[in-house]
């Protein structure tokens, strides 16, 4: 195995995994960043979503050999440096999580989407979030939280 350097949450981590290892398992097993969850292992449910250079990415389908030296990976643990991100705050205010398992992936998808569209309508939210599965069915609360967090973002809260 070759040692690889990966920029995760603003810090360079040296990992000892083979290049064909999915990023998800490097995050969880080697780096102990367990906020990113394993759901389906096929990139279909969204529980494993992280940001790769600011874009939502399924970490279960992204092998570490695909990462370039200047790539930046952000996990739920690195989403906000000081306080909670506005999306995280809205998730709490709207009481979105039930079991909470899918929520880190939901939040990471929402944050990336709201960077592209900070004033979405319901249809745009549903379209952006449709690849994230919540078995508890909290989709209505997710929509409310996204409207609330988009307002926070538009008002300058970071």
Identify the meaning behind each predicted range.
Residues 1-158:
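Signature of N-terminal electron-transfer/Fe-S-associated modules in redox systems
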């Amino acid at each position: 195995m070759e040692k690889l350097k990966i920029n995760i949450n603003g810090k360079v981590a040296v990992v000892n995994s083979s290049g064909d290892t999915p990023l998800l398992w490097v995050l969880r097993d080697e780096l102990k960043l367990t906020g990113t969850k394993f759901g389906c292992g096929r990139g279909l449910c969204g529980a494993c979503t992280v940001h790769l250079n600011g874009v939502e990415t399924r970490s279960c389908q992204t092998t570490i050999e695909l990462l370039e030296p200047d790539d930046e990976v952000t996990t739920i643990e690195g989403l906000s440096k000081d306080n909670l991100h506005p999306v995280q705050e809205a998730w709490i205010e709207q009481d979105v999580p039930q079991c909470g398992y899918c929520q880190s992936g939901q939040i990471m998808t929402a944050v990336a989407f709201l960077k592209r569209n900070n004033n979405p309508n319901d249809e745009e939210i549903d379209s952006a979030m449709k690849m994230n599965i919540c078995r508890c069915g909290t989709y209505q609360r997710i929509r409310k939280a996204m409207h609330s967090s988009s307002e926070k973002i538009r008002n300058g809260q970071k």
